[in-house]
Amino acid sequence: MHSLQAKILDPRLGTDFPLPQYATPGSAGLDLRAMLEEDTVLGPGQTLLIPTGLSIHIADPGLAALVLPRSGLGHKHGIVLGNLVGLIDSDYQGELMVSCWNRGESPFTIAVGERIAQLVLVPVVQAHFELVEQFDESQRGAGGFGHSGSH
């Protein structure tokens, strides 16, 4: 398991509400909570930037973090991430924020401390461009969308 530096920015985190944790031994994501001042209604089509009360510093350029939606919120209530996926670079040290979007047809109340997203650490491979005049031939070539089959 990797070590991850974290700062608590909201004193309710770790006292009134648990720190981010893995729900099961096999979980890939740490739950992030809505550290709002009060329960907030998100109307259909609305977006809201929600603080998590936490900042992290990954420090290792070979790692990044992804902020991903919680499957139940999206499937049952239409609550997804406004930016679809949040990317946290290894050198970012600010508060983790979650952009929530209600793509459903009904208002949804986000309760203070509710689990609204998950944080997943992923490996990163940084690349540099090697400029060439032509590529070596491949079987696919420049075939794009739908090129490899109809399904």
Swiss-Prot record:
Single GO term (MF): magnesium ion binding
Pfam families for this protein: dUTPase (PF00692)
Catalyzed reaction equations: dUTP + H2O = dUMP + diphosphate + H(+)
Keywords, sorted A to Z: Hydrolase, Magnesium, Metal-binding, Nucleotide metabolism
UniProt pathway: Pyrimidine metabolism; dUMP biosynthesis; dUMP from dCTP (dUTP route): step 2/2
Gene3D superfamilies: 2.70.40.10
Key word Ligase present: no
Entry's EC annotation: 3.6.1.23
Residues involved in substrate binding: R70, S71, G72, N83, L87, I88, D89, M97
GO terms, biological process: dUMP biosynthetic process; dUTP catabolic process
Cofactor requirement: Mg(2+)
NCBIfam families: dut, PRK00601.1
Family statement drawn from the similarity comment of this UniProt entry: Belongs to the dUTPase family.
Function field: This enzyme is involved in nucleotide metabolism: it produces dUMP, the immediate precursor of thymidine nucleotides and it decreases the intracellular concentration of dUTP so that uracil cannot be incorporated into DNA.
Protein name as it appears in the record: Deoxyuridine 5'-triphosphate nucleotidohydrolase
